[in-house]
Amino acid sequence: MIRVAKDNLLKEEEMNKSKLFKLLAFLAVVSLTLAACGGAAATATPAKSAKVTSTGYECPEPEFPAQVASKELNLFVWTQYIPDDMIECFELVSGIKVNRDEYSANEEMYAKLSAGGTSYDLVQPTDYIVSLMVRQGLLQELDQAKLPVLKNFNSDYLNFPFDPGNKYTIPYQAGTDAIVYNADTVENPPKSWADLWKPEYAGKMIFLDDSRAVIGLTLLTLGYDVNTKDPAQLDEAKAKLAELVPNVKLFDSDSPKTALIAGDADLGMTWTGEAFLAQQEKPSIQYVYPTEGAILWQDNWAMPKDAPHSDAAYAWLNYSMQGDVFWMMLRDWPYTQPNQASLDYAKGNQMQVNDANGNPTTLAKLYDAYINSPITNTPADAIKNGHRIDDVGDALPLYDQIWTEVKGQ
């Protein structure tokens, strides 16, 4: 009996070992299967060598790599006009530290450079002030051989009269100044610049803090050229503008959309991108091209004469404006795009992104919203009827005086 018991125990032990072996074999197969399944997911996870932003975006490699000795880059740019992850990607990919100062008006940037602000490598002048800065020797000619990224641009945005041959500038973004209003609160929407002088709009308006644009639209209401140098016409514009300014609740070039979204202003004048973003969050916001014609403009990159890190500046221009990087502007600051490569990259691209308000979407949907909106995709008749602000030469002090006196009244 004892022997039989021992035999039974031995048989039971052998059976347990067999079961254990089968279990281990099964677990090994499961482990291999999971690893194989995980392989597909791993392809979507950035490799250890990939450069990934704090938001989880995997940065593209440079399309136009170059040797750069400088370790920093100093930008002097418009407020809220460069996506943070665009800067972060450039820093990760290049190893160059980006320092950013901001301004709210071309005149602010011009004054600082004129006063000897020579620490900057790149600035963002709007078209009309480029010729003035060139004339005063504040900018250096660009070496186009170092800018292969120029191939990315729609030729409609190159070779403007303010910079023939793009000797000094490379396009950044374009757009319009036009009328904006909230359809839920404005019973009689304005159709012309002249309408903004109506008493019913007093205390409800927001205007850009932009002297040339505001004086320019005032000149248009009088039937004059936005670039007039005639002192008598400018005096007349000054008197008319003095009637308008007390009715303006807020002058803001940093974030005019904020007041429109919050309901602190019901109408006024603003830029393309600000109107588009306001409308995305508040659909009742409408954008109207005035009967006298909108103000047309283009912002550009330019290099100050004594830029201390020009090699880093060229690296920034080539990287930030390649198509798989500059698409970020469609998300954050959707103005009119001179960069055709970024539009081509975005079209039909199902990459998951967040919009400017943090809502999940795809890059293709951002493109569709851009291309289907008459705000960002400016209609041909609005361009034909529009006006570009130019350098007025010796008449500039007259414009400055008007703005200072009228706003200070």
For each of these PLM feature ranges, what is it?
Residues 1-72:
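Short, low-complexity disordered leader/linker segments with a strong preference
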Residues 48-132:
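Early extracytoplasmic/lumenal segment of secretory-pathway proteins
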Residues 73-84, 108, 119-120, 124-264:
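Extracytoplasmic ligand-binding site segments that recognize negatively charged/polar headgroups
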Residues 129-132, 261, 267-284:
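A ligand-binding cleft/hinge motif common to bilobed small-molecule-binding domains
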Residues 152, 234-243, 281-305:
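Periplasmic-binding protein-like
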Residues 178-185, 220-223, 297-312, 328-331:
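A bilobed periplasmic-binding-protein/Venus flytrap-type ligand-binding module shared by bacterial periplasmic
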Residues 304-378:
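Mature extracytoplasmic/periplasmic domains
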Residues 372-409:
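Conserved C-terminal helix/tail region of periplasmic/extracytoplasmic solute-binding proteins
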